[in-house]
């Protein structure tokens, strides 16, 4: 947990006939982060060649993607990954899968085509509506007027009579065309009718009418003087459009049901493809001679015994395994083959591990900053967002997020847990400051933040003004930077980089000057900005380390000469360079540390802003109180809106600023983010 | 003062657009779209992109043309959004850019009118694919489609910039039964209006816009000239009628001279050589198939525009350059998407869609 996991390097040789069994064993255990053998040798060993996969990986992946996509179009709306097992690793027949996928695609297109045809019917009906809408006001128009106006539109309107007995059959036959038919009156055994259709269907409609005993003629005015034909027609068309849209929707549901019915096949095929993809991915790292197969890779040292056991078992002990320490490999390959980095933290620290990885991975063998980030991040957040009520809201939001994202990616879940932690931190600091949604419900356990900002007594003698709050954050900053320096020294000692340990800005000399600077700063303030520490202190605190920094280049030169490296000539240029570098480094040390430390005042700044905003909303709510000073609905609403705004704005600001202080102030002291992530191939690897 | 106003004008808009650029479809998505087995699969790929609404329309209707309409709406929404955030001068300029969609939609409406009244075809369902909501002008598209007589047609276009263009071309439309001159005149209307609006911008912005619009005009002119030469065999004088003024490097007199003096094979290298020497080497690749040659021309011109856009994106963050680049990139994305989706719909081979 303190450092990145110890890695070990395996080089293995197995018989070709055992390679499939070995691949399965490697896939099942899933701990090896493969490195091609050619990378070790520099790629120029003619005796070994790559193993050619019998199936195209690209084809496997393409089919897998097609399945994911098609599954996602079912009723669930998303593809849900179910991890395959070794039992899924069967013989793969890509032709069969592609054939089945083509069948599914073809049927899907048939359904889409049906939807498209219905869509065109809808468009035609909508067109009829538009045409009808052009015929004056809906209240005044009559069948005669409608018929007369139709000569300029795409519509054709027939008026006349037909035997009442034929109406039902006619209306049934008419359904294949976008049209409207309406009975406007009945006299004896004949019905007066109005038929609206598109001009392009006129011929067919006339044929239908002829077959139904149609007699063309005006609708008798007496039978429908006030009949609102247009309104009725529009209503009828709307109804037909609604029916068509329902049919379209039903086809969409039919499509989703069609996909859902095949979920089992999709899932089985996906697992088959995924397991084969991983199987061939492992084999793509293999190199071969005529009778043997070679592979190599990194694994956490703790898995050495278990991997050894499964390999011996899979190869029936007909294999040769060689283990190497990371140092040997990096030296042999001159750093070409990097040691992968695995951070190993308990589950509750995973959200903070995510924050570290988001920045970068630490160098192999160095300190894993996760636990430190967890502590500092939460302290900073709590100080900036110190309100138990607001913290509780964050806790609830975090739990809600966990529920909502229960099927989503890991990072969404970790973010939800991080919000819960931040909320808990705010609950604790809120209790310390006695703030519950801005109200002092309980006495503060430490000091009353609100009272200080409002200019009242803080109920704690140690902290009485904003300056005291700022001072706390400066102390905190010094602690964070001091921790960073300490971690840097540990990293450098482990690496045996003594020069850097001594001379680096974040090395002992840098730390020495920072310590002296901190003491001098406080001394200066304590003496009301009028006195500095004695000359002896200044000489020891700043003079000696400054001179040591000046000596850095000559020491390096001597070491280079001793190490037999190319000699740098000692010339006036060398001395000028040395001087310039020294001045720049001194400036960097003084200005850099000062800026780093003062940067932590933002923690107080954000905290003050949080409290100030709440005070402002309380005052606004008070202004909205009733005439007798009683709370009104408006004052409650203002308080509610204020709290929501503060939680949203300040929560985001505090989260970002805490992250910023960790990344740019804390990490800059010791973190070398050059690590490559440990990435083993496993049957349990998620997409 | 100028600096302050340009920061005020562009800080928010450009920050927003720069973020949006991350949502632009990458080449990888286009390759996967091209490789998808059919239109349905291609649409499903869009589900996880910023074009999810297009897939939703297709899932509901199964109709590619309805999805295209959605794409056009999405494209216009980009301009309308910037319009909301811009000040008055910028809004006027954005309107000038939006004019291209108004014109595009009017062309669609007029093509239907032409089909119905000149070619006497049925347009009942096709009229469902025109955009009815107003873009810049409020006019009744259905009244246009229903107008059988010229007077009614012009009456239905009252209040738009299209009245004069239609009036001037009506005789040729009826006699020659072609929309070609009308559509060319509408393109001219767009570019002239855009160049006029440019004059209201600050010097820095005007230079950027003139350069970019000038490049677009150059590319449009090159495409036209090549088509005139290859497909229509226009005389230089006929060609001259349809040339857009305002090009960045290729002025009308130079185009006229090159058109008059070059044969089919030499025209493209000559045009590129005169204005865009850095890509003229691409034009030397011989293509015998006339369509392949046009595809090659289009890809070369696209490359030219890409280079210009890249320069602008790396330039001043508080200028109109970012906005123009964003519009061009998105327009390019949408047009490429439409081409691929149509290619899938008609079962075109992959290599035809790559161009």
List where the protein language model places each region.
Chain B
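N-terminal domain-start signal
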Residues: 1-355
